[in-house]
Protein backbone atom coordinates (compact mmCIF):
# COMPACT_ATOMS: atom_id res chain seq x y z
CA UNK A 1 0.00 0.00 0.00
CA UNK A 2 1.23 3.50 -0.80
CA UNK A 3 1.27 6.31 1.71
CA UNK A 4 -1.66 8.71 1.79
CA UNK A 5 -1.07 12.31 0.72
CA UNK A 6 -3.41 15.23 1.37
CA UNK A 7 -3.77 17.93 -1.29
CA UNK A 8 -6.21 20.49 0.03
CA UNK A 9 -9.54 18.68 0.22
CA UNK A 10 -8.25 15.76 -1.87
CA UNK A 11 -6.60 12.64 -0.47
CA UNK A 12 -4.63 10.28 -2.71
CA UNK A 13 -2.88 7.01 -1.95
CA UNK A 14 -3.29 4.42 0.74
CA UNK A 15 -6.61 2.70 0.18
CA UNK A 16 -8.32 5.88 -1.03
CA UNK A 17 -10.52 5.80 -4.15
CA UNK A 18 -9.17 6.83 -7.53
CA UNK A 19 -8.37 10.53 -7.98
CA UNK A 20 -8.66 12.36 -11.31
CA UNK A 21 -6.02 14.87 -12.41
CA UNK A 22 -7.43 16.58 -15.48
CA UNK A 23 -7.65 19.73 -17.53
CA UNK A 24 -6.55 21.19 -20.85
CA UNK A 25 -3.01 20.58 -22.04
CA UNK A 26 -2.29 24.30 -21.99
CA UNK A 27 -4.02 27.43 -20.74
CA UNK A 28 -5.51 28.81 -23.96
CA UNK A 29 -7.22 31.78 -22.30
CA UNK A 30 -8.87 32.60 -18.99
CA UNK A 31 -12.47 32.04 -20.07
CA UNK A 32 -11.83 28.62 -21.62
CA UNK A 33 -9.79 27.51 -18.62
CA UNK A 34 -12.46 28.48 -16.10
CA UNK A 35 -15.15 26.93 -18.26
CA UNK A 36 -13.23 23.65 -18.43
CA UNK A 37 -12.56 23.64 -14.68
CA UNK A 38 -16.22 24.28 -13.88
CA UNK A 39 -17.31 21.51 -16.22
CA UNK A 40 -14.80 19.09 -14.72
CA UNK A 41 -15.95 19.90 -11.20
CA UNK A 42 -19.57 19.27 -12.18
CA UNK A 43 -18.68 15.97 -13.83
CA UNK A 44 -16.58 14.77 -10.90
CA UNK A 45 -19.19 15.79 -8.33
CA UNK A 46 -21.74 13.83 -10.34
CA UNK A 47 -19.76 10.60 -10.09
CA UNK A 48 -18.14 11.27 -6.68
CA UNK A 49 -14.55 11.39 -7.92
CA UNK A 50 -12.01 13.76 -6.36
CA UNK A 51 -10.49 16.26 -8.80
CA UNK A 52 -7.18 18.07 -9.16
CA UNK A 53 -7.25 20.62 -12.01
CA UNK A 54 -4.31 20.56 -14.41
CA UNK A 55 -3.22 23.10 -17.02
CA UNK A 56 0.19 24.24 -18.23
CA UNK A 57 1.12 27.92 -18.36
CA UNK A 58 4.05 27.20 -20.69
CA UNK A 59 4.61 24.16 -22.91
CA UNK A 60 8.38 24.48 -23.14
CA UNK A 61 8.95 21.25 -25.08
CA UNK A 62 6.62 21.68 -28.06
CA UNK A 63 7.74 20.01 -31.29
CA UNK A 64 8.07 23.25 -33.29
CA UNK A 65 9.27 26.72 -32.35
CA UNK A 66 6.06 28.08 -33.90
CA UNK A 67 3.75 25.93 -31.72
CA UNK A 68 1.49 27.65 -29.18
CA UNK A 69 3.12 27.53 -25.74
CA UNK A 70 0.62 29.26 -23.48
CA UNK A 71 0.28 32.62 -21.73
CA UNK A 72 3.52 32.38 -19.77
CA UNK A 73 4.18 31.90 -16.08
CA UNK A 74 2.88 35.15 -14.60
CA UNK A 75 -0.43 35.21 -16.46
CA UNK A 76 -0.86 31.45 -16.25
CA UNK A 77 -0.38 31.35 -12.49
CA UNK A 78 -2.86 34.21 -12.13
CA UNK A 79 -5.47 32.18 -14.01
CA UNK A 80 -4.76 29.05 -11.97
CA UNK A 81 -5.10 31.08 -8.77
CA UNK A 82 -8.49 32.24 -10.03
CA UNK A 83 -9.52 28.60 -10.58
CA UNK A 84 -8.54 27.85 -6.98
CA UNK A 85 -10.31 30.88 -5.56
CA UNK A 86 -13.52 30.51 -7.55
CA UNK A 87 -13.96 26.73 -7.42
CA UNK A 88 -12.01 25.65 -4.35
CA UNK A 89 -10.17 22.82 -6.11
CA UNK A 90 -6.42 22.09 -5.95
CA UNK A 91 -4.34 22.85 -9.04
CA UNK A 92 -1.24 21.38 -10.66
CA UNK A 93 1.08 22.66 -13.36
CA UNK A 94 4.58 21.90 -14.60
CA UNK A 95 7.79 23.87 -14.12
CA UNK A 96 10.74 23.87 -16.52
CA UNK A 97 13.55 25.71 -14.75
CA UNK A 98 14.81 26.40 -11.24
CA UNK A 99 13.76 30.05 -11.57
CA UNK A 100 10.12 29.04 -11.96
CA UNK A 101 9.96 26.93 -8.81
CA UNK A 102 9.49 29.62 -6.15
CA UNK A 103 6.71 31.63 -7.87
CA UNK A 104 4.97 28.42 -8.92
CA UNK A 105 5.01 27.15 -5.33
CA UNK A 106 3.09 30.25 -4.22
CA UNK A 107 0.08 29.14 -6.29
CA UNK A 108 0.27 25.45 -7.13
CA UNK A 109 -0.87 22.70 -4.78
CA UNK A 110 1.16 20.18 -6.78
CA UNK A 111 4.31 21.05 -8.70
CA UNK A 112 4.89 18.75 -11.64
CA UNK A 113 8.33 17.79 -12.94
CA UNK A 114 8.04 16.99 -16.67
CA UNK A 115 9.14 13.58 -17.91
CA UNK A 116 11.98 15.01 -19.99
CA UNK A 117 13.38 16.74 -16.88
CA UNK A 118 12.89 14.04 -14.24
CA UNK A 119 16.63 13.31 -13.97
CA UNK A 120 17.69 16.94 -13.60
CA UNK A 121 18.94 16.71 -10.02
CA UNK A 122 19.12 20.43 -9.24
CA UNK A 123 15.60 21.01 -10.53
CA UNK A 124 14.11 18.02 -8.71
CA UNK A 125 15.80 18.99 -5.44
CA UNK A 126 14.66 22.61 -5.73
CA UNK A 127 11.07 21.47 -6.21
CA UNK A 128 11.39 19.17 -3.20
CA UNK A 129 12.54 22.07 -1.03
CA UNK A 130 9.21 23.86 -1.51
CA UNK A 131 7.52 21.14 0.56
CA UNK A 132 4.66 21.24 -1.92
CA UNK A 133 3.34 17.95 -3.24
CA UNK A 134 5.65 16.91 -6.10
CA UNK A 135 4.38 14.93 -9.08
CA UNK A 136 7.26 13.48 -11.10
CA UNK A 137 6.48 12.09 -14.51
CA UNK A 138 8.62 9.08 -15.33
CA UNK A 139 10.81 9.80 -18.33
CA UNK A 140 9.91 8.00 -21.55
CA UNK A 141 13.48 6.68 -21.41
CA UNK A 142 13.47 5.32 -17.84
CA UNK A 143 12.79 1.98 -16.22
CA UNK A 144 10.18 2.09 -13.45
CA UNK A 145 12.61 0.88 -10.77
CA UNK A 146 14.96 3.75 -11.59
CA UNK A 147 12.36 6.18 -10.25
CA UNK A 148 13.48 5.18 -6.76
CA UNK A 149 16.56 7.32 -7.35
CA UNK A 150 14.39 10.29 -8.31
CA UNK A 151 12.34 9.78 -5.16
CA UNK A 152 15.58 9.70 -3.17
CA UNK A 153 16.51 13.15 -4.47
CA UNK A 154 13.22 14.59 -3.22
CA UNK A 155 13.41 12.76 0.09
CA UNK A 156 16.88 14.30 0.64
CA UNK A 157 15.09 17.65 1.10
CA UNK A 158 12.84 16.27 3.83
CA UNK A 159 9.80 16.33 1.54
CA UNK A 160 7.84 13.08 1.60
CA UNK A 161 4.84 14.35 -0.38
CA UNK A 162 5.59 12.59 -3.66
CA UNK A 163 3.50 11.24 -6.55
CA UNK A 164 4.88 9.28 -9.50
CA UNK A 165 3.23 9.29 -12.92
CA UNK A 166 3.63 6.80 -15.77
CA UNK A 167 3.23 8.34 -19.22
CA UNK A 168 4.47 5.68 -21.62
CA UNK A 169 7.82 4.43 -22.88
CA UNK A 170 9.53 5.29 -26.16
CA UNK A 171 9.06 2.47 -28.65
CA UNK A 172 11.01 3.22 -31.80
CA UNK A 173 10.38 6.51 -33.57
CA UNK A 174 7.27 8.65 -32.95
CA UNK A 175 5.63 6.03 -30.75
CA UNK A 176 5.02 5.18 -27.11
CA UNK A 177 3.84 2.00 -25.42
CA UNK A 178 2.48 1.41 -21.93
CA UNK A 179 4.02 -1.35 -19.84
CA UNK A 180 1.44 -1.96 -17.13
CA UNK A 181 4.06 -3.73 -15.01
CA UNK A 182 5.57 -0.32 -14.29
CA UNK A 183 2.55 0.68 -12.20
CA UNK A 184 2.85 -1.95 -9.44
CA UNK A 185 6.64 -1.71 -9.65
CA UNK A 186 6.57 2.02 -8.91
CA UNK A 187 3.92 1.59 -6.22
CA UNK A 188 6.37 -0.67 -4.36
CA UNK A 189 8.53 2.42 -3.84
CA UNK A 190 5.78 3.46 -1.43
CA UNK A 191 4.23 6.56 -2.96
CA UNK A 192 1.00 7.13 -4.91
CA UNK A 193 1.17 6.26 -8.60
CA UNK A 194 -0.84 7.90 -11.37
CA UNK A 195 -1.33 6.76 -14.96
CA UNK A 196 -1.28 9.45 -17.63
CA UNK A 197 -3.80 8.01 -20.04
CA UNK A 198 -3.61 10.71 -22.69
CA UNK A 199 0.13 11.28 -23.07
CA UNK A 200 0.52 7.50 -23.20
CA UNK A 201 -1.32 7.47 -26.54
CA UNK A 202 0.68 10.37 -27.93
CA UNK A 203 2.72 9.96 -31.12
CA UNK A 204 5.63 12.35 -30.37
CA UNK A 205 6.44 14.50 -33.36
CA UNK A 206 4.30 12.17 -35.44
CA UNK A 207 2.74 14.96 -37.50
CA UNK A 208 6.01 16.57 -38.52
CA UNK A 209 5.59 19.96 -36.88
CA UNK A 210 3.47 18.66 -34.01
CA UNK A 211 2.71 15.47 -32.10
CA UNK A 212 -0.08 13.14 -33.10
CA UNK A 213 -2.14 10.87 -30.90
CA UNK A 214 -4.52 7.94 -30.76
CA UNK A 215 -7.40 9.13 -28.60
CA UNK A 216 -9.38 5.98 -29.36
CA UNK A 217 -7.08 3.95 -27.08
CA UNK A 218 -7.40 6.15 -23.98
CA UNK A 219 -10.29 4.17 -22.52
CA UNK A 220 -8.62 0.79 -23.03
CA UNK A 221 -5.36 1.82 -21.38
CA UNK A 222 -7.21 3.62 -18.58
CA UNK A 223 -9.24 0.54 -17.71
CA UNK A 224 -6.13 -1.64 -17.71
CA UNK A 225 -4.19 0.80 -15.54
CA UNK A 226 -6.95 1.23 -12.96
CA UNK A 227 -7.24 -2.55 -12.73
CA UNK A 228 -3.67 -2.67 -11.35
CA UNK A 229 -4.77 -0.68 -8.30
CA UNK A 230 -3.25 2.72 -9.08
CA UNK A 231 -4.03 5.79 -7.02
CA UNK A 232 -4.95 8.28 -9.72
CA UNK A 233 -5.63 8.78 -13.41
CA UNK A 234 -4.30 11.76 -15.40
CA UNK A 235 -6.12 12.97 -18.50
CA UNK A 236 -5.92 16.02 -20.68
CA UNK A 237 -9.43 17.05 -21.68
CA UNK A 238 -10.95 19.67 -23.95
CA UNK A 239 -14.44 20.77 -24.95
CA UNK A 240 -13.45 20.40 -28.62
CA UNK A 241 -10.17 18.45 -29.00
CA UNK A 242 -10.06 19.05 -32.75
CA UNK A 243 -9.66 22.77 -32.04
CA UNK A 244 -7.27 22.43 -29.08
CA UNK A 245 -4.08 24.49 -29.35
CA UNK A 246 -1.99 21.66 -27.89
CA UNK A 247 -2.27 17.85 -27.78
CA UNK A 248 -5.73 17.75 -29.34
CA UNK A 249 -5.20 14.33 -31.01
CA UNK A 250 -4.77 12.61 -27.65
CA UNK A 251 -7.13 14.71 -25.51
CA UNK A 252 -10.46 13.37 -24.24
CA UNK A 253 -13.60 15.27 -25.17
CA UNK A 254 -15.35 16.55 -22.05
CA UNK A 255 -18.67 15.12 -23.25
CA UNK A 256 -17.14 11.63 -23.18
CA UNK A 257 -15.64 11.90 -19.69
CA UNK A 258 -18.64 11.07 -17.43
CA UNK A 259 -19.22 7.62 -18.93
CA UNK A 260 -15.50 6.81 -18.81
CA UNK A 261 -15.17 7.89 -15.18
CA UNK A 262 -18.10 5.69 -14.17
CA UNK A 263 -16.34 2.67 -15.68
CA UNK A 264 -13.03 3.51 -14.06
CA UNK A 265 -14.67 4.09 -10.68
CA UNK A 266 -16.35 0.68 -10.88
CA UNK A 267 -13.06 -1.05 -11.67
CA UNK A 268 -11.30 0.85 -8.87
CA UNK A 269 -13.94 -0.28 -6.36
CA UNK A 270 -13.36 -3.91 -7.31
CA UNK A 271 -9.57 -3.91 -7.00
CA UNK A 272 -9.28 -1.90 -3.76
Curated annotation (Swiss-Prot):
Keywords: Cytoplasm, Lipopolysaccharide biosynthesis, Transferase. HAMAP family: KDO8P_synth. It is an enzyme of class 2 (transferase). The gene is kdsA. The keyword Phosphoprotein does not apply. This is 2-dehydro-3-deoxyphosphooctonate aldolase. One of its GO terms (molecular function) is 3-deoxy-8-phosphooctulonate synthase activity. It is found in: Cytoplasm. It comes from the Bacteria. It comes from Geobacter sulfurreducens (strain ATCC 51573 / DSM 12127 / PCA). Its EC number is 2.5.1.55. Belongs to the KdsA family. The keyword Metal-binding does not apply. Pathway: Carbohydrate biosynthesis; 3-deoxy-D-manno-octulosonate biosynthesis; 3-deoxy-D-manno-octulosonate from D-ribulose 5-phosphate: step 2/3; Bacterial outer membrane biogenesis; lipopolysaccharide biosynthesis. GO terms for biological process: keto-3-deoxy-D-manno-octulosonic acid biosynthetic process. InterPro entries: Aldolase_TIM, DAHP1/KDSA, KDO8P_synthase.
